[in-house]
Amino acid sequence: MSFSLTFTELANIAIPQCGVLNFKALHLLLHGILEHIHMAELKKVLSGDEDFLQTSQVVIMPREGDAQPILNPMKRLSNVFDHVVSRLDKLENQLALLQDLPSTAQLLEASQGTARPVQDLWHLIKLRKMVEGHDEVMAKSMQTLQDLLTDLHALQVTITALRKEVDMLKNMLDKVHPERMDIFAEDFKIQNWKMVALQREVASLQNKFKTIPKTEDMVLWSGLHDAMFTSEIGSSPLDLWQSVEQLPEAALAQTTKYLEATRAIQVSEPVQNPQLLQTVWHYEVPELLPEGSSAQAVSLSRAQEPAQPPALTPESAPGCTTEFAPGPAPGTEPVPGLELGLELEPVPALGPVPGPSVTPGSLPAPWPVLGPVPAPGAQPPPLGDWPALPRRWPLPQGWPRVGSWPLWDLGVLRPTQPQPSRAPPPATEFGSLWPRPLQPYQSRQGEALQLAAVQVKGEENDVPSLRGLRERARKDGAPKDRTRKDGVPKDRGGKDVDPKDRAHKDDVPKDRGGKDVDPKDRAHKDDVPKDRGGKDGDPKDRVGKDGAPKEAQPKAPQSALHRLKTTAAIAAAAAAAYAAATSSAAQAAKVAAKFVKDAPATKMAAIATDTAAAGPLGVFADVLGAGPSRGATESQILGDDSEIYEILSPSYSAASIGPDPALSQAMVATKQAMSPEDKKRAVKYSMSHIAQIPVKHDSLKEEFAQLSCNLNQRLSYLANMGGPSSLGTTVDILQKKIGSLQKSRLKEEELERIWGNQIEMMKDRYITLDKAVENLQIRMDEFKTLQAQIKRLEMNKVNKSTMEEELREKADRSALAGKASRVDLETVALELNEMIQGILFKVTIHEDSWKKAMEELSKDVNTKLVHSDLDPLKKEMEEVWKIVRKLLIEGLRLDPDSAAGFRRKLFKRVKCISCDRPVEMMTGPQLITIRKAHLLSRLRPASANSCEYLQRQQMREQQWLQLQDLGIQEDCQQDWGDGPQNATSLKCKSCNLLTLYPYGDPHVIDYDSAEVDILGVDGILYKGRVNSQRGAQPLAVAKELAAVKAPSPPSQSLYDRVHSSALFGAICPPLCPRSSACSAASGPHLTMPARPPSLPPLLLLPPLIPSLRDPQQAPGSTRLSRAPHIESRVGRKPPEEPANP
């Protein structure tokens, strides 16, 4: 089937596109052209040197006998293609060899001569590997390139979005008002200060929360009561209250070993005033007072010889101790507390030693050398040294640790072997009134200071007070834990031991305790002594019964004198020790009271302090030995005998007076408190007396000073008077008072130690209670807050029925379908999170620059004018704006006298060439060309290019139609911050701007009707008129236009002309807030008119001059916002084109 084609169609088939050639179709086309022009038979002469006629370099030499080849041009031309074909065949063969590796047989066949097929094969294999590697590298490179392109695309999208955000931020920044920024800055500062204060409050609250103690750290009234009134030493049989209640009973038991008898002494010689002993002795006091410890007998005796000074017997001499015989002595009743089980050790014979002097001078030692007793009339031994102490003998078992207290030692007596040649006389046991801490033994420092005591032998005077004390002691009886019902004492293990056996075990002389005497008989003898049964009281019988050799009795004045000296020395030492102990107790009490006062001022501490102000040591006045019940009397002047006998009457000689019954009952009630209220009152009652100790100490010191003064006066008066019948009674009374003072001092020490520990404990408890009260107060405040929140929640709680109904409702599937899935939400949340993180990162990066911008902005804002200064300027601006608005609405009109542009002025300042001085010269006229859509005088000028011109013409018409379709809405205002607003709509006349002449009078030359040359945007001069289709403008508008010259930059290039048109279009935007929002939503074609692709984009800028606003303006918005620079908003400028001629 044949068909026909035109040569054009055949040419299109031969060359369908660039780079593609169909040789057959081209061959057919060329032959058809040759036949059509009749050139098929024509010939072309060739020189033979053409390139396409050159044959291959491989020349096939003819063999011998062959004919020479005939050179044919056509054959030579065909050989060129044959050579190419052979080369292609060779390449195909080599490629086939490369694809399939040669076999072993092929390698053997090829291994001939210099051929190296194996080496070639190895090179081929390496080449393949290299090619494969390059292939992989290229594939990886392409993949990386694709990834980079993908990332670049994502980056481009991000940059586009960022540009939009930046533009939006710029718009927002343009709308920011300086006065609002000031308000926001002030609010921010206030909020910052509030946050700092809130942080401080939170820190303080955290510290307060940290100080809240735990429950176990809180102390209740019951725990405080248990800590104060419960003994912590279980092994001790006595506590504070037992010591308060039992000590008076122990004092009663001590009276059984008091002076058995005193004899009437006749004074026949004068007695000098005695010198009191000014020495302080140290001894060790146990920390606790075991029960029955105050009933020890310390027998002090003396052996009196004719013409010999009174001396101590070996049993009572310094350095010796009284044997604690468990058996009863003749004429005495067993006293509890004597079974101490001390091992008596022999001591070397005592030689002459110097004793403590009674007078300021030195006297011979008042005791003899152990051994044979010197005969009557012997001289006193010479001065010597104190006996060396072999070693310390151990303390009695069961005693606690000891402490050293400055007190008078009644005699550090050494255990000695009793002398069989002498029987101990009846001892004047005034030491039995002293409690157990006065038990003599070696001090810690090894001191051996002794006091010379006088032992009186013979009959005792019948003292009614002593008989009464004995009878009271017999009625009270011995303690049950130490004595059986039949009166036989028990040993430490609780077994009944015969007194005889015990006496032999303890090495007591048979003379003293060797006889077995029935306890009843012994008690009867104690009750009614036979020695005192006679009226005369013959001393001879008493001495005989005692078993001691009858010796000459000393004279009465010596006995009275020495007894008086001994009593005075005892009283002085006791007074000094009592004063020292009282001062130390007062100091400790002051320190404790200070600690208590320094404790946190809680309610309980305040009540305790107020209660403690009632008086110092009021409840313990009688117990501690103060007051008249303990022998303290006011200072009196001893005038006559009647006062002496009245003061020394037996009514003041009571050695043991029970404590105040009200006090004992209060203590018992305090200790037995059970309920919390009772314990609270007990603690307050006890604390009320702690602060009274210092004041009471002062009163005790004053009373003691009065007692010392009275004692000195009495002793002086007794020494001067020398009353024979009252000396013994006075000494006994003084001894009783001294014993009572000593017991009171010991009680003070015990109470001081116990109360000191309790004060420390109470101080710690007070601190803990104070913290607990603070924590409770804080928790109460938190509880109140929580309670208010609970009430608020109860008021705002959700209705249960409504909530249940909402829960019962089924979900709508269509509504659920329209909702996003969780995966999408999570993805969006992740993206938002990343975006927020990026924004925060950018914010942190640009924070410094923002701060600087804020500082500059604040500086600029601070330099703004005041509202009152801007009022005149505002009025002027409104007037100018009215004129400009009219000009913009009616359109620009040519003013020959106006300037040509921004850069060209009416007068140009130049300099003279010859003299170089400034000269003002008028500038020449200059054409100002602005783009206009309807500038063509005819549809197609002769010089215009058809395709390009038509395209531009169509695009201009479309742009003009779009600008007309925008539609300027009436009654629409533009939002320009706080500036004035105008309801009048502005018509955009920017596209009506034409070519203007800078000079000339429009009245003289009618530019509206005259035909002028106009330079078009395509660079071609056209003939046309200035006025538009609407007709000429009124004359008033032209005058206003001449008066107000609108600034316009010179348009030297095409871009400048377009920029000037866009700028004039941006000066008067016709959209109000509503219309602008609608136009923004309608799409980009409303906000950006169509433009030719060769022109740069037209930027829509905010208006430079705000529209008028209603008179009712917001307060604080009087500042005039500055218009941004036009040059900074337009963007970059392309390179300028050469100026138009």
Swiss-Prot record:
Which residue ranges have biased composition labelled Basic and acidic residues? 468-553, 1124-1141
Asked if Coiled coil is a keyword of the record, the answer is: yes
Keyword annotations from UniProtKB, A to Z: Coiled coil
**Which segments carry the region annotation Disordered?**
296-339, 416-439, 455-561, 1105-1141
Q: Which residues form a coiled coil?
A: 74-101, 145-176, 757-810
InterPro entries per record: DUF4795
In which residue ranges is the amino acid composition biased (Pro residues)?
Answer: 417-427
Name of the featured protein: Uncharacterized protein C16orf96
Q: Which organism is it from?
A: Homo sapiens
Q: Lineage of the source organism?
A: Eukaryota, Metazoa, Chordata, Craniata, Vertebrata
